[in-house]
Amino acid sequence: MRRILCALTLAAYPIGGVLADAQTSATEIAVHGSHNAKVTLVYEHELPNVPGKSVKGVLVEYGPGGASVAHTHPASAFIYATVLEGAIVSKVNEGPETVYRAGESWSELPGDRHAVSRNASSTEQARLLAVFVLDTGETNLVLPY
């Protein structure tokens, strides 16, 4: 399972020429109610060996003190998130608030509620890459609850 998740994370980085039919242009995603946060779809590609499923890479950038509102994701979405820079405070469902630092990861299962997602610092930027595996037709990736 860990190898599959690592492969999906690597697949989220655009690789010129290798995935010619993949979307590699960035598209900002509107997340209403977030503070000092930018969410950008940086990659998407249908999974050729899993009909009806796609992988999407989403870059989340928090400025100092930045945060997202409590949210969930499409019911079909499995998410593997890796902190690229800084530190992120995350709380999924009724679990504890956990601080993840650069290089650390967590996952969210279909139906999970992301109660807390914020930058742990009030002075430094933080970034994470969330890799979604979900139904191909899903376009609204962040849903308030």
Predicted regions and their residues:
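Structural motif
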Residues: V55-G57, F78, A126-L128
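Extracytoplasmic low-complexity repetitive segments enriched in small/polar residues
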Residues: Q23, H45-N49, V60-P64, V89, ...
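Conserved short histidine dyad/triad with adjacent acidic residue
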Residues: K56-P74, P96-Y100, L109-R113, D135
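Glycine- and acidic-residue-biased ligand/ion/polar-headgroup-sensing regions
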Residues: A75-G95, A102-E104
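Extracellular/periplasmic catalytic domains that process cell-envelope and extracellular macromolecules
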Residues: N49-K53, P74, T82, V99, ...
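Ligand-binding loop in jelly-roll beta-barrel domains
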Residues: P96-E97, G111-T139
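A short, N-terminal "cap"/entry segment at the start of jelly-roll beta-barrel domains
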Residues: R2-C6, Y13-K56, E97-V99, W106-S107, ...
